[in-house]
Amino acid sequence: MIQKGSIKARLMIGIAAVIVVAAACSSAPGASTAPGGSGAASGAKYTIGFSNPGGVGNGWREAMLCSAKAQAVKAGNVTKVTIIHRDTDAPGQLSDIRTLIAQGVNAIIINPAGPDALNPAIAEAIAAGITVIAVDASVTAPGAYNLSNDQEQYAYLGASWLFKAMGDKGAVVYMRGIAGHPADTDRDTGFQRALKEHPGITIAATTVTKWDPATATQQINDVISAGTKFDGIWTSGVDSNIVDALKAAGHPYVPIVGADNAGFVTQLLAADGPKGAAVTNPASIGGAGVTLALQILSGQKPAATTVHVTPELWSNTDDAGKAKLTAAADPSLPKTWPLGLTIDGWTTYTKAELIACKGPGDA
């Protein structure tokens, strides 16, 4: 866990917490590979809302929000950012979005609890002239923009590697994220596609981790205690704690797939670590969402309403993968934080600014 005084403590985002950060002034971001350029409009000032319904205590979600705060500071034309971050469901997020609408923000960034359930509130926001951007996963509401990792490909890459590492036979523990979350749904599509291509693979157990490390640890312990035989583990980003649980239980390591989280990458590079692969899933998509919002607000709309970041797979079973893992490794980060701290063309803050996790006006 992240200790008091660390990034998590500085983020100050507890259940039902609402964080308001005030004005900042610095240079506007360049966005050479992002659609439409920097997004800065001369003299224009904007307010941004961010709704994140879940993942309180999850390192990826913490990094996403820190990224948004850091990019808002760098933009120089954001007067306030309001973040509503709590563990809730789609109806709860509908309420949160409407709270942001009532505050009169210019743009709302959401990590959506569902692809369709938020459409009524999104439609209300768009009718009020508010730009709406979904990050991490997509929504279907007309007029909204989607900016995320390609989650289907994320799962397909990892599952395909895993099944080959298992010798195209055996049983896998399938550890999913949050039921109904569009990213989880897309990942399941990718996982099932890979599964069909490897008929020798069966599923030993399926769990829904809610992307919570403690929940995932209990689930793998339950699988082990039940005597369920398995030959591989696919995790939806809760990974280092699963390796720790195998070790604590005295269970032999099996091939495992996770995300590019700091702790997991360190484990993959260890001489006595498991055979495994990390698939990239940058939480800096939060900061990229700020950049896209500012571009749209300044009249620089992208050609498409959905933009995907392409994931990569880094395995410790080949030289190229080991080189990627070694280059990305960063033991200074909390183990649950992803290593994709920035996205070229979309974010302009430094690592130190991200880790400080301070938005405009924060002391």
Name these PLM-found stretches.
Residues 41-43, 47-71, 75, 81-95, ...:
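Extracytoplasmic "Venus flytrap"
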Residues 26, 39-46, 194, 292-363:
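Hinge/cleft segment of the Venus flytrap/periplasmic-binding protein
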Residues 19-24:
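C-terminal motif of bacterial Sec signal peptides marking the signal peptidase cleavage site
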